[in-house]
Curated annotation (Swiss-Prot):
Component of the CatSper complex or CatSpermasome composed of the core pore-forming members CATSPER1, CATSPER2, CATSPER3 and CATSPER4 as well as auxiliary members CATSPERB, CATSPERG, CATSPERD, CATSPERE, CATSPERZ, C2CD6/CATSPERT, TMEM249, TMEM262 and EFCAB9. HSPA1 may be an additional auxiliary complex member. The core complex members CATSPER1, CATSPER2, CATSPER3 and CATSPER4 form a heterotetrameric channel. It is found in: Cell projection, Cilium, Flagellum membrane. GO terms for biological process: cell differentiation; spermatogenesis. This is Cation channel sperm-associated auxiliary subunit beta. Residues 1-1053 are extracellular. It holds the Pfam family CATSPERB_Ig-like. Auxiliary component of the CatSper complex, a complex involved in sperm cell hyperactivation. Sperm cell hyperactivation is needed for sperm motility which is essential late in the preparation of sperm for fertilization. The gene is CATSPERB. Glycans are attached at N90, N100, N118, N226, N321, N618, N690, N913, N921, N1010, N1015.
Length: 1116
């Protein structure tokens, strides 16, 4: 008893090893929370939340089988102080908010009030991801969770427009008799925002489109528009028979193909007061008969937080052969879709006989164009890939042309699964390419049926195929198996996946979803009961071990060649379950096609989960006798003991299988008489000959279909849990900058009882563009035999781009909610990545508001700038020369504006062309921004005492993973935006930095500094505004940070040097002037001085010694 307990403990520990991960496929799909932000929440409703300019207010209650039980559960939670948490997430964001208990209309509800800026600060109209919301409550060992969506209504582009005249619901129903088909398209980033269009007959003219923001869950969420006049306004002549043909909603544009031409909307991001207008694309030589057979092709990708290399492409194809006057029957364009160019390279334009282009798609991950050609004469299909150069396909193929087999005789088109690199070609077969169109793998063969439509969900990776006969098939992106899920009986319908992956069937006047919230992901009620995927033939089981069995499918000798496929196992049976009419089931692990043994052209290897029921003597009397087996040519003769009278072969024994432990099994094909029958061996090499088997040593299985098929094949229940530890989102987007790497972990946990331990990989990993990043994988089996994979991706080239990284549980059932995870890795700069200056002294935000924050000596560290302030220049404090105003107010006078040079400079930015500061519309963030672009709004700056020496310029990089100090190999340049010069930088220069400086500085023409240990000294006064820029080549990001320092209490300048200089100049000038005047008057001071000296000498020499003595005595 100890071993199971230990095992359970280890299992639990390993399950919670990824503390931040979510385990999928656990069948805990019962939805317990009902929530709404538009009135009182309704029970059993999908959670649809909407974000407007005001706060997001959400009310939730705990729903059970009745109101009394709900209140009882709430009292339990309340007494325990429990309340649910709300997770809001998309591919790059994850926020957690907590509910509070409140009372509303005698109902106990949980309430949360979230300011919009706590979710997003952006209000501009752009392609923005719809958020997923997950409401979770932990109570003991129970985890109650419910998922929903949150749509930012004010930012979604298409919702800001009125594309035509609004049609009342009562009027739209009058069009139903004239509708011949439906077309649906959805927003790439918010799949709950979708458009539904009517294709009408020639009796009714017009383009009629319905727009929903709630994923077609309710009729009242759809607004209908008549766009007829909008389209007619672009036609220069009078036309008739206008109808929608196809449409595509891209990230920023709506493209509509009608019977009278192709029309492209204006940019949806810039709404105006008028209705949405369109421009018409001109295709020379094409008429209505061509347009009604046209198709639009689009590689759906979400461009939220758009990169410069991300752009939408749309292709239009026409079902006609090119003539000498026409350049192509296939055209493509990139946004803004103003110029449509032929899909074929120029080298093919002169060729008269060339295969028809069925589809042309742009693979943005690899930068290629993928073609699907079809030769109607030879009935052959090929795929070709060309490199795009300047957005035009190269005439030379990137890979060798892939030729589909002749069995792919009716190709229809190609499609990329959204946000991935999985490429599907479909028609009477389905082919999958995981390497950009270089090679394809056969997924399904429908023979005389043709797949006409495909529908995709990026969230669950689900794909639905619909054939021209109305049969519906499903698979998961990247998987090599598929299932039949039923059929559609309506003549006019279309399918649609919403943002949470629910499948909807849209018909005239009725929208059906794939089940209530308690049946998440279940599509069976849309298409009836799950179909039996068996086929009309007999199976012959052959045991190979106690838990492994092979089923051989019988093909009669007289079976027509064209119907042999209907008697064989196919790809559809891979991963399914064989059920016996009695008891027993087995999981199909492998499908085999072969030509021997005779009569068996296919087989499956299956793992027995439950033993199959044997025939009893009362069902087959032959079991009461011994059995003699003799070979008779290509068949075997089975003979019963003639002494046992009651033992007889009967017609009901035909297609039953004789099982002999240790030998080949035999399928009975005919009865010769009561004691003799003919059979074929499943394994002739191990078949006995001229051997007798006693009673009870041989057995009979009945897997025949002569008296009604006794076996069935259904989908296998989900057999794996999937967990990843990085984000609650399945479709995360991660940015990898130059020199950086990213690690992603995932775990696959078996949940089947009695499963076999197989040391084989349970995950397959595909990289969309293997040339972009260096991707490595490390796999292990943990103590519970769960499969753990660690993926490391690192940048390796100075090239920006994106690639999808697909994790596929290849052995999982298609019934699993999650079999495929497709994160996107971008070799680029994250929009969340920025550089920040760390102030040397922290000042709380409330002190910034008040403008007072004093240090220990009473010195205020905040300076409120004068109105219309400009920093001084090198010419003096009173002569500012910068264009930047601070604390701008156009209604107030401008100080320091007396000199002509100062009057010529100085320009308002935020306050340009307004008369008061209030009209500048400065936001709170702009008022405290260090950016020079918002200097008009800046009012307060950090204040320091003179002098500033060795001020540490500390910088850090902030991204979604945290904060990292800025250090080498990042190098920076530093400038003062107001052109002040009395400052100096000091930094350490190691040998490696020294070499980089020598290489970079001549190129940049500026000094480069090491950010580690960077110090600043300032000798001037008043405001200094610095900009720090990381040099290019070491990051994809444009990392720029600005900071300001106000230097106050600077002493007056010492005048000694100036006075000495002036005195010296005056003395020298006076001497030079006197010398000039002497020269001008002819006065020679030197000569006069010399004569005076000589006269004195002569006079002194004429006096005698006695006279000198006499003079000295008289003086005494």
């Amino acid at each position: 008893m100890e071993s199971p307990l230990i095992y359970v403990s280890v299992l639990l520990l390993n399950i919670f090893e990824f503390s931040s991960g979510i385990v999928y496929n656990k069948d805990d799909t019962e939805k317990r929370f009902a929530c709404s932000n538009k009135g009182f929440p309704q029970e059993n409703e999908i959670i649809k939340l909407y974000l407007f300019l005001e706060n997001l207010k959400i009310q939730c209650f705990f729903q059970t089988e009745n109101e009394i039980a709900s209140k009882a559960m709430l009292s339990v939670f309340t007494s325990g102080g429990l309340a649910p948490s709300l997770g809001i997430m998309n591919s790059t964001y994850n926020g957690i908010f907590h509910f509070n208990l409140t009372l509303f209309s005698d109902r106990i509800l949980w309430l949360v009030d979230i300011p919009r800026e706590n979710i997003t600060q952006s209000t501009d109209i752009a392609a923005v991801e719809e958020w997923l919301v997950r409401i979770t409550l932990h109570h003991g060992l129970n985890i109650y969770a419910t998922e929903g969506t949150l749509l930012d209504v004010i930012r979604e582009p298409i919702l800001q427009w009125t594309p035509g005249d609004v049609i009342p619901e009562s009027e739209i129903s009058k069009l139903y008799p004239h509708v011949v088909d439906l077309k649906v398209t959805k927003c790439p980033c918010a799949n709950d925002v979708a458009l539904l269009g009517f294709i009408v007959d020639t009796i009714v003219d017009g383009v009629y489109i319905g727009i929903t923001f709630g994923g077609f869950w309710h009729d009242y969420d759809t607004t209908w528009f008549n766009m007829t006049q909008t389209i007619y306004s672009q036609l220069q002549e009078e036309y008739e028979d206008l109808s929608l043909v196809d449409m595509v909603l891209t990230n920023h544009f709506l493209v509509i193909l009608t019977s009278l031409g192709l029309f492209v909307s204006e940019d949806l991001r810039y709404p105006s007061r008028h209705s949405l207008s369109f421009s018409r694309a001109d295709f020379c030589g094409f008429e209505r008969v061509d347009y009604v057979k046209g198709k639009l092709w689009y590689n759906e990708r979400c461009f939220a937080n758009r990169e410069h290399f991300e752009v939408d492409y749309v292709t239009v194809t026409f079902e006609r052969n090119r003539t000498l006057s026409e350049s192509s029957s296939c055209f493509y364009s990139q946004e803004p879709f103003l110029e449509w160019v032929p899909c074929l390279p120029h080298i093919f334009k002169g060729i008269k006989i060339f295969p028809t282009v069925l589809t042309f798609l742009v693979d943005q991950e690899r930068g290629t164009g993928v073609y699907l050609f079809y030769n109607k004469v030879r009935k052959t299909a090929i795929a070709s890939v060309s490199t795009l150069r300047n957005n035009e396909p190269n005439s030379q193929s990137k890979f060798p042309i892939f030729r589909f087999p002749s069995s792919f005789s009716s190709p229809v088109g190609m499609v990329f699964h959204p946000r991935s690199h999985f490429l599907y070609a479909y028609g009477n077969q389905i082919w999958l390419s995981v390497d950009g169109g270089n090679t394809f793998q056969l997924i399904a063969n429908f023979h005389d049926d043709i797949i006409k439509k495909t529908f995709h969900s990026f969230y669950t990776s689900a794909i639905t195929f619909v054939s021209q006969r109305g049969k519906v098939y499903s698979t998961k992106a990247g998987m090599g198996r598929y299932s039949a899920v039923g059929s559609v009986t309506e003549r006019i319908f279309t399918l649609y996946y919403d943002h949470l992956g629910f499948l909807h069937k849209l018909t005239l006047g009725r929208f059906e979803a794939s089940g209530p919230p308690t049946a998440f992901g279940n599509s069976r009620n849309l298409f009836g009961q799950p179909p039996d995927m068996g086929f009309e033939t007999a199976l012959a089981p052959q045991h190979t071990s106690l838990d492994e069995i092979i089923f051989f499918a019988y093909v009669p000798e007289n079976e027509p060649q064209e119907t042999i496929y209907s008697k064989k196992f196919g790809n559809i049976h891979y991963g399914k379950v064989i059920h016996s009419g009695k008891t027993g089931r087995a999981y199909i692990r492998k499908v085999l096609q072969h030509t021997t043994p005779k009569g068996f052209l296919s087989s499956v290897i299956a793992e027995m989960k439950e033993p199959f029921g044997l025939e009893e003597v009362n069902e087959s009397s032959c079991l009461s006798s011994s059995l003699l087996i003799n070979k008779a040519g290509n068949v075997y003769k089975l003979t019963l003991d003639s002494q046992v009278v009651q033992a007889l072969f009967e017609d009901t024994d035909i297609e039953k299988t004789v099982v002999l432990p240790g030998y080949s099994s035999f399928l009975i094909t005919s009865i010769l008489d009561n004691k003799n029958a003919l059979a074929i061996a499943t394994m002739p090499e191990s078949a006995p000959n001229n051997m007798t088997f006693l009673k009870s040593t041989w057995f009979l299985y009945n897997f025949g279909q002569r008296n009604g098929r006794t076996w069935k094949i259904y989908s296998k229940p989900c057999n794996y849990w999937f967990q990843h530890d990085d984000s609650p989102s399945l479709n995360i987007v991660k940015y990898i900058d130059l020199g950086n790497s990213y690690v992603l972990k995932a775990k696959v946990i078996r949940n089947a009882k009695g499963f076999r331990m197989l040391e084989i990989p349970l995950l397959t990993v595909f990289v969309g563009n293997p040339n972009l990043l260096e991707v490595t994988a490390e796999v292990t089996f943990d103590d519970t035999d769960s499969y753990v994979i660690t993926i490391s991706a690192a940048s390796k080239v100075l090239h920006q781009g994106s690639t999808s990284l697909a994790f596929i549980m290849w052995s999982a059932s298609t019934e699993c909610f999650v079999t495929t995870m497709v994160p996107t890795l971008k070799s680029s700069c994250s929009y969340l990545r920025s550089m920040h200056h760390i102030p040397s002294k922290f000042i709380p935000f409330e002190d910034w508001i008040s403008g007072v924050h004093k240090d220990s000596q009473g010195f205020n560290l905040i300076k409120t700038l004068p109105i219309n302030y400009r920093p001084p220049s090198n010419m003096g404090i009173a002569i500012p020369l910068t264009d930047n105003f601070y604390h701008a107010d156009p209604s107030k006078p401008i100080p320091r504006n007396m000199f002509h040079m100062s009057k010529k400079t100085g320009k308002f930015k935020q306050c340009a062309n307004v008369s008061t500061r209030e009209e500048c519309n400065c936001t709170k963030d702009q008022k405290f921004s260090h950016a020079v672009a918002f200097s008009d709004c800046r009012e307060k700056v950090p204040r320091f005492k003179f002098p500033i020496t060795q001020y540490p310029v500390s910088l850090e990089i902030i991204n979604e993973d945290g904060r990292v100090p800025l250090q080498s190999p990042y190098l920076v340049t530093v400038t003062e935006v107001n052109m002040r010069h009395n400052w100096k930088l000091k930094h350490t220069v190691p040998e490696n930095i020294k070499r980089m400086k020598q290489l970079v500085e001549p190129i940049l023409g500026a000094a480069v500094y090491n950010p580690s240990g960077l110090n600043l000294s300032i000798k001037g006064s008043e405001l200094f505004h610095f900009r720090v820029t990381v040099i290019s080549g070491v990051t994809f990001c444009n990392l720029i940070e600005e900071f300001q320092i106000y230097v106050d209490e600077a002493p007056l300048p010492f005048p000694g040097h100036t006075l000495i200089a002036v005195a010296t100049a005056v003395v020298l000038g006076g001497l030079i002037f006197i010398a000039f005047m002497f020269q001008l008057q002819g006065i020679h001071p030197w000569r006069t001085f010399q004569r005076w000296i000589r006269r004195n000498q002569e006079k002194f020499s004429s006096i005698s010694l006695s006279e000198l003595i006499h003079r000295s005595k008289s003086e005494e």
